[in-house]
Amino acid sequence: MTDNSKIRVVVGMSGGVDSSVTALLLKEQGYDVIGVFMKNWDDTDEFGVCTATEDYKDVAAVADQIGIPYYSVNFEKEYWDRVFEYFLAEYRAGRTPNPDVMCNKEIKFKAFLDYAMTLGADYVATGHYAQVKRDENGKVHMLRGADNGKDQTYFLSQLSQEQLQKTLFPLGHLQKSEVREIAERAGLATAKKKDSTGICFIGEKNFKQFLSQYLPAQKGRMMTIDGRDMGEHAGLMYYTIGQRGGLGIGGQHGGDNQPWFVVGKDLSQNILYVGQGFYHEALMSNSLDASVIHFTREMPEEFTFECTAKFRYRQPDSHVTVHVRGDKAEVVFAEPQRAITPGQAVVFYDGKECLGGGMIDMAYKNGQPCQYI
């Protein structure tokens, strides 16, 4: 039997049930476990309560229960510089960013990993639903979590081989329901705590209200692609491609009673384009360009391959052909795709393995850009 007592694992503990069970399982497996709470955002809720303080209390309670030391580390500056500035720049450019992908790459598996090394860590661990598997050459492959509904490899797709070599995902083989059961059986303080939602480390604030604190909204015209004026929009940054709600126009404007959707943006003229029908022609595309292309292991500078891909979290995989040229790629779809959104991640899979991915720059229909951006 392996003696894990000399292997130190530093666990990123958020105060939620997933990271609590992560620490518990590692402790039960005999590892030398240390818990670390990351404070990445200066946050208070509508009642003036600092939610980070409440979460840290939960971390302390769980760490005391399972008998591990714990620390708090402040990454507010790193988060602002490496994640939040990027987040704002993307919205200024009319795109819809995915800050969770950048947060994992820059904070949880860079700033936190570096800090863990100063504590003498051999590995870091988090409560993500993903799996790592070593091959005979010592290379680490990242596999989807066993719970399809919770798999988080989409958000981990920018991690490097070096980061994965130092990472453990103890929940990867479990269903979420099993994680709750483990927490309840152990009587953990977080066993019944609800899952957090919302933007990475910003929580459940009203998004429109939150964004307006940092970016001035500029109202403009809402139009159909054939030039019909449909009224005023509140600011392009508040809308994403394929969005249905919040437009303030109903079926009465159309004649066929189909709902209205955002189909494009023109940043230079501050126009929001809308169209009727879930599969409106302006929402459909057959390829995309992506940048910041990254693979979890070494790949050639230029190559072409077939795989499946996700263009947003929680969507079925689609078959694609990928033409890689350095850190850029053209991704050609086997079937037309709906609402491909600049700023979101495209993530590549080979069966259960997550190969990596990139950030969507533009969608194309028959070679023509189709987002009006």
Curated annotation (Swiss-Prot):
Disulfide bond is among the record's keywords: yes
Region (Interaction with tRNA): 150-152, 312-313
Cell compartments where the protein resides: Cytoplasm
Enzyme class (EC, first level): transferase
Region Interaction with target base in tRNA, residue ranges: 98-100
Residues given in the record as ATP binding sites: G12, M13, S14, G15, G16, V17, D18, S19, M38, G127
Annotated disulfide bonds: C103-C200
One Pfam match: tRNA_Me_trans_C
CDD domains per record: MnmA_TRMU-like
Entry's Gene Ontology cellular component terms: cytoplasm
Primary location: cytoplasm
EC number annotated for this UniProt entry: 2.8.1.13
Gene Ontology biological-process entries: tRNA wobble position uridine thiolation
Site features described as Interaction with tRNA, chain residue numbers: H128, Q344
Record: active site: C103 (nucleophile), C200 (cysteine persulfide intermediate)
GO molecular function, one term: tRNA binding
Keyword hit for Transferase: yes
Alphabetical list of PANTHER family matching this protein: MITOCHONDRIAL TRNA-SPECIFIC 2-THIOURIDYLASE 1, TRNA 5-METHYLAMINOMETHYL-2-THIOURIDYLATE -METHYLTRANSFERASE
Entries under HAMAP family matching the protein: tRNA_thiouridyl_MnmA
Protein family (similarity comment): Belongs to the MnmA/TRMU family.
Role noted for this protein: Catalyzes the 2-thiolation of uridine at the wobble position (U34) of tRNA, leading to the formation of s(2)U34.
Name of the protein in question: tRNA-specific 2-thiouridylase MnmA
Organism: Streptococcus pyogenes serotype M49 (strain NZ131)
